[in-house]
Amino acid sequence: NLVSDIIGSKKHMEKLISIIKKCR
């Protein structure tokens, strides 16, 4: 499903951003 893929990628990006912020 396109919508679920977009939501999933959004959560994935938020997770990556939180990891990057922890490294800084």
From Swiss-Prot:
It comes from the Eukaryota. One of its GO terms (biological process) is defense response to bacterium. Keywords: Amidation, Amphibian defense peptide, Antibiotic, Antimicrobial, Disulfide bond, Secreted. Expressed by the skin glands. The keyword Metal-binding does not apply. The modification Arginine amide is found at R24. One of its GO terms (cellular component) is extracellular region. It is found in: Secreted. The keyword Flavoprotein does not apply. Its main location: secreted. Homodimer; disulfide-linked. Antimicrobial peptide. Active against Gram-negative bacteria E.coli ATCC 25922 (MIC=1.5 uM) and P.aeruginosa ATTC 27853 (MIC=23.2 uM) and against Gram-positive bacterium S.aureus ATCC 29313 (MIC=11.6 uM). Has no hemolytic activity. Associates with and disrupts membranes in vitro. This is Homotarsinin. It comes from Phyllomedusa tarsius. The lineage of its organism: Eukaryota, Metazoa, Chordata, Craniata, Vertebrata.
